[in-house]
């Protein structure tokens, strides 16, 4: 998914634009067998995406911003020594998403969930924040079982995207059904690359003003088709901890699709 078409839509008329989006794709997948009985479904390998939101602002009221949305920048703020200023709250958050809760279904609450989300992509506000979170994850009782791959860094993104990709590929290994990884990023690997083994993306950065194009480019990293150890990836997930932002982005995306 490229951001360029989003930026160019205003330069073209309706009769010059052809749209084929995720909703159309999944609709075609669901109707294929009825419309084309006996023919192989060309959309069968494309996973369904499900977006789950958890309202951290309700649980951690101190981190609301001026529009009452969750402030990830403040939540993950680090001091001059690279330590989290709100480390206690971040540890609470990490414990929370591993907490068994039948009503909330936190993503790492059960062994079954952890096996399904054995390879995930976490977006953070910046390089220093990713480095600090990497240290906390490695010492955590649950996330310490995962290999933490920190691809957040400074420098030219295009030059280092390939290096970041190789870091993730090495960590996942040749038998992804046996390994566990969490990839931390603040920008890299959000465009132009695919990691088929990723089944979830955690949106822990951005704000109420995050652009629809940037958001959609990032979350669709996890919709890449995959067959691992004979099993087809049929579902992929987005976990966003700022529900208002999620709704705003989806509404903007719907407007863009309708316009196209």
Model region roles, listed by residue range:
Residues 1, 18, 49-52, 149, ...:
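Hydrophobic/aromatic beta-strand patches that form the interior of the parallel beta-sheet core
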Residues 1-6, 126, 186-188, 242-244:
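A short beta-strand-to-loop transition that corresponds to the Sensor-1 phosphate-sensing loop
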Residues 8-121:
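Interdomain helical connector at the RecA1-RecA2 junction of SF1/SF2 helicase-like NTPases
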Residues 39-44, 140-143, 230-231:
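Short, conserved catalytic or adaptor-binding loops enriched in Gly and charged residues
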Residues 52-57, 125, 241-244:
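Structured loops at beta-to-helix junctions and adjacent beta-edge loops in soluble globular domains
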Residues 70-185:
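Conserved C-terminal RecA-like helicase domain
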Residues 148-259:
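Conserved RecA-like P-loop NTPase helicase motor core
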